[in-house]
Amino acid sequence: MNKKSKIYIAGHRGMVGSAIHRKLLGMGFTNIITRTSTELDLRIQETVNEFFEMERPDYVFLAAAKVGGIMANNLYRADFLYENLMIQSNVIHSAYATGVKKLLFLGSSCIYPKLAPQPMKEEYLLTGLLEHTNEPYAIAKIAGIKMCDAYRAQYGCNFISVMPTNLYGPNDNYDLQNAHVLPTLIRKFHEAKQNGDPAVT
């Protein structure tokens, strides 16, 4: 990528998307496109197609997703599956249709089997049952990975996937009911220290 390449960051307000945005700005990239979910609903194919046709980005970081902790994943199973499948499918296909040079899709560690040997290796994907509580989210993420693979194989697209795991940081969700494990623990430890509590449960 050169400094004037047109770069679209889908999900620029989330933890990973905002980190990518900050890093690119810090490196001197000046042609970065962002849209909030209110400005561009990635679940609607027609609006995504129109956006890509109008903007024609050279590079895409696909960090947009419906995310949440164990409780949210287990309660809103259909929403997590449907919304993530729609976001991924619409962005990946529109990137192909408009000739995006490279797309980076963000997967998740939950794509690996619940009982995968430790430490986990890439080849363990699809070798066992997934954790039930976040299975719909994991299935959607697996579909995104396989979609990138399929578009690369059939159309020669430079679409790749990465699995950022056990992340926390600025713009993360620290809500005790909906956050992932690490931010939840950080919040509990922080509150315990502030309150002088001897232990965390």
Model-predicted segments: where are they?
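N-terminal Rossmann NAD(P)H-binding glycine-rich loop of SDR-like oxidoreductase domains
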Residues: 4-27
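NAD(P)H-binding glycine-rich loop region in Rossmannoid oxidoreductase-like domains
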Residues: 45-85, 97
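SDR active-site strand-loop-helix element
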Residues: 10, 35, 60-66, 103-109, ...
